[in-house]
From Swiss-Prot:
Annotated organism of origin: Mus musculus (Mouse)
Pfam families in the cross-refs: V-set (PF07686)
Signal peptide boundaries: 1-20
Framework-3 as annotated region, ranges: 86-117
Disulfide bonds: C41-C115
Annotated segments matching region Framework-4: 128-138
InterPro entries: Ig-like_dom (IPR007110), Ig-like_dom_sf (IPR036179), Ig-like_fold (IPR013783), Ig_sub (IPR003599), Ig_V-set (IPR013106), IgHV (IPR050199)
Name of this protein: Ig heavy chain V region TEPC 1017
One Gene Ontology term of the molecular function aspect: antigen binding
Spans annotated as Framework-1: 21-49
Amino acid sequence: MGWSYIILFLVATATDVHSQVQLQQPGAELVKPGASVQLSCKASGHTFTNYWIHWVKQRPGQGLEWIGEINPNDGRSNYNEKFKNKATLTVDKSSSTAYMQLSSLTPEEFAVYYCARSDGYYDWFVYWGQGTLVTFSA
């Protein structure tokens, strides 16, 4: 009977740790066409440097587009070819925050931008930020 309780405790603890993972993003950014914007993604509930952070774009009525990923431990990054000259990914380890700078914004960049993280074992994204809507001011 003792082993059952130990296993139950370990499962409950692991589930609780998973439920604590958060990726916090601002709700919206208002920018002028041609300007640049820096989006943030503050991680908590896990060791920031252990997991790659991904960025994903979604335009209204369209599917998801993977922009790129960054390794918070050493700053290595990989980009979708389409976004290589548009997005720049960086991290600040001291604040457990990932950033994506978008330059020379056009109406094409009117979209919601999500940061995401895998569970560390598989490639799909288990944890998502709430997304930041980039809208344009006149």
